[in-house]
A protein has these predicted regions:
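Short, low-complexity disordered leader/linker segments with a strong preference
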Residues: 1-69
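Short, polar/charged alpha-helical segment
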Residues: 37, 56-67, 71-97, 174, ...
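Short, flexible turn/loop "capping" segments at secondary-structure junctions
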Residues: 65-67, 166, 214, 290-293
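Extracytoplasmic ligand-binding site segments that recognize negatively charged/polar headgroups
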Residues: 73-87, 99-115, 119-260
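A ligand-binding cleft/hinge motif common to bilobed small-molecule-binding domains
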Residues: 130-134, 262-281
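Periplasmic-binding protein-like
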Residues: 170, 234-239, 245-246, 278-304
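Bilobed periplasmic-binding protein/Venus flytrap-like ligand-binding cleft at the lobe interface
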Residues: 190-199, 296-308
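Short, catalytically relevant binding-site loops at active-site mouths
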Residues: 252-253, 269-273, 289-292
Length: 308
């Protein structure tokens, strides 16, 4: 597979799940006429790679090829602070102009689908893997080999067809405003079923499944825990307590500290970020009856204008 310098973006901010760039050796082909020809071609490619490395390194060649293309454009579905830092760091490291547009995972999927093989961006960076899997099924992502994929914790942190690789992991749970709960004389919810109690009516926020991959994961989690029919009944009951469905998955977490939201459902790392911003009135809760986690991914969009 062709090596892609665009993947270096993931390298700059990978959190131990994977890094990117490079390719793995292919398995030995069977001895047929076609296989012999393929082996010869592979040998020639290997020689070309060796020449490149001898001339200053394979990565150096990729960097120069990418610089010649002028810029890198990113659709980002992680938090904007993280996305901005990744792009700035990439630009600083490699001297390649990098620009981004922050969109939810569902928005990126819709946009790339509409662009039909001629995407406005080159890389999709961050956001839960479910929409990435949909994009794989629709043929919207470019397969690539990541040389550092051998460092993955497990195979569940990458696409089986190598169309995306994980760059972080997030645990699903609740974030509550302890001051507001105390003012209302309420205990914090401990389980998913607790969220349907009448005492929490109008106090809960979660993201919209039409726009946020986070909400889709919440739905999938309940289906796995309860079965489809019981899960649908659960969401009917939960809906009675929902004050607002936000556009983005991190939206509810941002409203907990200021008191606009008493109980938020989402990824706990979003709550940690708010605590680091000074909101020490936020408590993080891992549901006692079980939960799930996301794998935040990165991928190259098929038909990217800057493939190197």
């Amino acid at each position: 597979m062709k090596k892609k310098l665009a993947l270096l973006l993931a390298c700059t901010m990978a959190l131990g799940l994977t890094a990117c760039g490079g390719s793995k050796p292919a398995a030995a082909p069977e001895t047929t006429a076609a296989a012999t020809e393929a082996a010869a071609e592979s040998s020639e490619e290997s020689k070309a790679d060796e020449k490149t490395e001898a001339a200053g390194g394979d990565m150096d060649a990729l960097i120069e090829a990418a610089k010649a293309e002028g810029e890198l454009t990113v659709y980002g579905s992680c938090e904007e602070e993280y996305l901005s830092a990744a792009c700035q760091n990439f630009e600083k490291l490699y001297g390649i102009k990098t620009k981004y547009q922050r969109l939810s995972t569902s928005e990126v999927y819709t946009k790339v689908s509409e662009e039909a093989g001629k995407p406005s961006a080159d890389v999709w960076f961050g956001g839960t893997m479910d929409p990435y899997n949909e994009a794989v099924a629709a043929g919207l992502l470019e397969p690539y080999d990541a040389i550092n994929a051998v460092n993955l914790i497990g195979d569940e942190y990458k696409d089986p067809t190598n169309c995306w690789y994980g760059i972080y992991k997030g645990i699903l749970g609740f974030m509550v405003n302890t001051e507001e709960l105390e003012r209302l004389g309420l205990e914090a919810p401990k389980t998913w079923d607790d969220l349907t109690k009448e005492e929490y009516k109008g106090l809960i926020m979660m993201s919209n499944p039409n726009t946020a991959g986070t909400a889709k994961l919440i739905i999938n989690t309940m289906i796995q825990m309860k079965g489809h029919d019981e899960a649908m009944e659960y969401f009917k009951a939960l809906d009675k307590n929902i004050a607002q469905y936000t556009k983005s998955g991190s939206g509810p977490s941002k409203m907990v500290g200021p008191g606009e939201c008493v109980i938020a459902i989402g990824f706990l790392h979003d709550g940690i970020y708010q605590i680091l911003q000074g909101y020490d009135n936020i408590q993080l809760i891992v549901p006692e009856d079980g939960t799930s986690f996301e794998v935040g991914a990165t991928a190259i969009l098929k038909g990217a204008s800057h493939p190197n």
